[in-house]
Amino acid sequence: MSNVTTLLDAKSVPEAKAALVCPSRNETYSYKKLRDEMNRIGFGLLSLGVKKGDRVCICLDSSPEYLISYFALWRIGAVAVPTNIIYKGEELLHVINDAGAIAVITDRQGAGVIRSIRKDAPALTHIICCGGACDGTLAWESFPPAPENMRAANCSTADLCHIQYTAGTTGKPKGAMLTHGNWMTALDTERDALRLTPVDTYLGIYPMGHVGLSWGLAVIRAGGTYVMMERFDLEHYLALAEQYEVTILAGMPPVIHSLVHAAPGTEQRLKHARVIISGGGGLLPVVWEGFDKRYHIPVANSYGLSETIVIGSGTTTLPEYPQLTKNYQSVGVAVGYTELKIVDTADPEKELPFGENGEVAIRGPAVAGGYWNLPDATREVFRQDGWFLTGDIGNLDAEGILCITDRKKDMIIMSGWKIYPTEVENVIIRHPAVADVAVFGVPDERKGEFPVAAVVLRPGAALTGAEFEAYCRNHMAGYKVPRNLIIVDSLPRVHGWKLLRRDLRQKFGGSRS
């Protein structure tokens, strides 16, 4: 049987051991309690008529109920469709209708939004509400215990279990179709890449509606303990790392940046950590180098997408690749059974030589089967030979080490020159007045496009256009220098880290002042 939830049936893990800890609610789920809750909710869904292959949306904040919902749906062979409690009605309606969801699991806040759009969601039959029922919903707490003999649905590796809607950085979200086989491969790969064991404790901060959840599931797959945070707060993060003697830290670029600039003595508070994971966006070399020199904790700078359940490559500190720990530009080597290659952006059939920039392509058993209800979009990037075109620009060296340069859609072409925004940002972020930066292209009748920089200044700092231009010209070729400096209070990011250059182009695309 290939049902991914069989990871909770392992006899090698003591049933009383903590699998999931939610410190904000002072709740601990042992492996037995987590399995019992999974079966209870799964059995309740079966009693409502949810069957194998049916799609069910999860609309919750990160919580034990979110994780249990995944497991319960997978247990009965249904398909989890994760969303986020911050979605507005129109965003939720798109996902619910596109997926054809027959039920939604939410809380009292989300129930109000869903009830307001229910009339426009013809397939939606049930709203299950955590925290007590309200009008038109069923209470999560009302489902009775499952029979003792309840077992996982018989699923194959090819059976769909998850539709992960992309963040929509290039338009309307697309649903990546993920299977039990995809998930089992990803969890085993992540477990092996980080050499996870039952003694590991993981501090997770990735939103549970995001495939970054897989790191927490990989720790459970290894028999360890997953300590969850609903949202990042530096002091709380450090306190939990100390209290639970955390060995595996979840990090995103903003988290690692915060740690670089944290108070003296913070190093001691992370003394149990043996690795920190970075994912979900590019980690600037200056930030990585600063973290490395201060903490001496290896950074697993991972690369992947919704379409690959995170897994593509990673700078895991394997003995055979010691150089990864000091290559601050790299996202490492292909992990597990994943294959990587670089192809021509105009002709994906043409593989490029080592060191040359092109589109990153990934092939392997964790790669999604395509996009839900979008055959044309599927054919465009999921090739018949199994290669997935990521839309990211990068290069491979002779040792198989991957460096991501930029997004294909973000590349700026000015008078025939190719400008990679991330490369320019890596220079600008080193300016002492700059806290955050985004470089993007705007149309120009004569040159096609030209680069613009939106900059967030450090508190109390100032930066004039002339100073900015002089700095850039001293550190990069003239054609790469942004033609305009825009000072902003913040940059648009998904989940707090993935940059939405599209929003900047829409807002400032006509500005040259």
Task: Describe the function of each predicted region.
Residues 16-18, 129, 145-165, 172, ...:
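Conserved pre-ATP/AMP-binding loop-to-beta segment of ANL
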Residues 19-63, 67-71, 88-93, 181:
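Conserved AMP-binding/adenylate-forming core of the ANL superfamily
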Residues 24, 109-157, 262:
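ANL superfamily adenylate-forming
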Residues 28-32, 161-185:
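Conserved AMP-binding A3 loop
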Residues 87, 93, 104, 249, ...:
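AMP-binding/adenylate-forming catalytic core of the ANL superfamily
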Residues 184-201, 208-248, 262:
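Conserved AMP-binding/adenylation subdomain of ANL enzymes
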